[in-house]
Each structure stands twice: as structure tokens, then as C-alpha cells.
Amino acid sequence: MSNPRPHLLIIDALNLIRRLHAVQAQQALTPAQALIATRANLINTCRKLLAASEPTHVIAVFDGEVHSWRKEVYPAYKEGRTPMPTELREGLNELQDAFWECGVDALLSQTDEADDLIATLATGIAQHGARATIISTDKGFCQLICPQIQIRDYFNKRWLDAAFVEQQYGVAPAQLVDFWALTGIGGSNIKGVPGIGPKTATQLLQQYGDLASLLAACQQEDAAKALLKLRQHQDEALLAQRLVRLQRDIPLGFNLREIRYPPAPEA
């Protein structure tokens, strides 16, 4: 019997945990009770994901106390975001143990953002012809969509696929980075081109294809009004493009054998 084609399940750990905890925090619970309930719910959710996905490999990726390269080049990156509740931050080790209880290893880096680690993992396995499923509500991962990479929004019970991207943004997944370069991403405090909103960005990309072609077109004497805005703010667009594009080539320091599921029994 041949071995099944590898299928890597990648869990955006804090994306999942924060939403599970928010539900418990709305109940009449003490912080300690909310953390206990979150842990129990996390184990239950993790087991559901494993049963539904039937992965051959699985990993939960955490954000560490990262001062990322994005913050270095753009100090306002993610400024204004609601901080994680103190009791949740203090309980993360216990929640990480909950993943291990389910047979799921955890990856945490002090130098790289979880989004870039997830992109590297998914892209790496896809390049070898295997499948990756990312569990997250973060639409930023939609730039990775291809036949080998899919994104599941667990809470809204939907796939963030090419059809979703087309409906939501009017462009293909491969054009999303350039779409956000024009519009910016409010949740990450990334500014795009002033005066270019989603509708105009969609129209421009449908006509020109990508940001490079738009930058060439905006230099023409008879450039349209929207292109003139881009000409005036092309540095902002290029910075936004750099910030929203996920890194896919981070050295990880481990191989697939170490995250096989179910894990090999200890000798």
C-alpha cells in the first residue's frame, strides 16, 4: 500500500485562541475560569480540525514577542491594535500544552511573524506537490491560494478560496498583494494610495494586471486621474506592497518528519 500524499494542517494558533477566548470572556466568568474554558474548547476544536482534515502532518504556529522587520521599516505597523488580554498572554504556555495534548507540535519564533512562518510552511510543501490547509480567519493568507494551498475560516465555516477572493475583491489571489498595495490594510495600519479605494483598485488591476504595469502606465502624459494619484504616491504603494507580501523563504530548522500526525510513539 502506497503512502498517502502529504497533507500539512497549519493552525494559526493565536488567531484561533483569541477568538475562542473572546467567547468565554463574554460570559460571567473570572479570568481564571475563562482560561480554563478556553483550554477545554481549544482541545475540542483541535480534535475536530484533525478529524475533519485527516492530515499527515500538523503544526500550530504562534507569534512570539516579535519586533518584526515590518516594524523596523514602518514603525506604525499594527499600531492601534487591541492588545491581548493580560490573563490570556500569561496563560499561553498552558494553551500551548493543550495543542501537545492533541498530538500537535507548536512553532514559536522570536524573530519572525507567524504569518511569514505559515506562508513558508505552506509554500514549501506545495512546491513538493503536497497539500497544505491553513486554519485562520486572516484574509492575508489568500495571497497564497493555489491548487495545493487552501484556507479554512473555522468560525464562519467557509473556505477562503479563489471564488471568495473574486467575490470579495474582484481580483485573482495572485493580484491581492497589489490590490492591498493600492488600498492599504486598515487592520495592520498599512496605508495605500490616498484616494484609491477598493472599487478603483479592482478596476485598475482588471485593466493593467499588476502594480508594475500600473506604475509604468502612470508615467504616461495622458494618464487617468487614478493613475495620477498613484504617480504622486508610488513610494507609499511600493512600501505597502512590501509590507503585505508574506515571506515564503524563512529557514525553519526542522523537517516534516518531526511534525508527522499522529506522532510516532516515543521509544
Swiss-Prot record:
Keywords: DNA-binding, Endonuclease, Hydrolase, Magnesium, Metal-binding, Nuclease, Potassium. Gene3D superfamilies: 5' to 3' exonuclease, C-terminal subdomain, 5'-nuclease. Its EC number is 3.1.-.-. GO terms for biological process: DNA replication, Okazaki fragment processing. InterPro entries: 5-3_exonucl_a-hlix_arch_N, 5-3_exonuclease, 5-3_exonuclease_C_sf, DNA_polI_H3TH, FEN, HhH2, PIN-like_dom_sf, Xni. CDD domains: H3TH_53EXO, PIN_53EXO. Residues 195-200 are annotated as: Interaction with DNA. Residues 171-261 form the 5'-3' exonuclease domain. Pfam families: 5_3_exonuc, 5_3_exonuc_N. SUPFAM superfamilies: 5' to 3' exonuclease, C-terminal subdomain, PIN domain-like. GO terms for molecular function: 5'-3' exonuclease activity; 5'-flap endonuclease activity; DNA binding; magnesium ion binding; potassium ion binding. It comes from the Bacteria. Its cofactor is Mg(2+); K(+). Has flap endonuclease activity. During DNA replication, flap endonucleases cleave the 5'-overhanging flap structure that is generated by displacement synthesis when DNA polymerase encounters the 5'-end of a downstream Okazaki fragment. Belongs to the Xni family. This is Flap endonuclease Xni. It comes from Aeromonas hydrophila subsp. hydrophila (strain ATCC 7966 / DSM 30187 / BCRC 13018 / CCUG 14551 / JCM 1027 / KCTC 2358 / NCIMB 9240 / NCTC 8049). The lineage of its organism: Bacteria, Pseudomonadati, Pseudomonadota, Gammaproteobacteria, Aeromonadales.
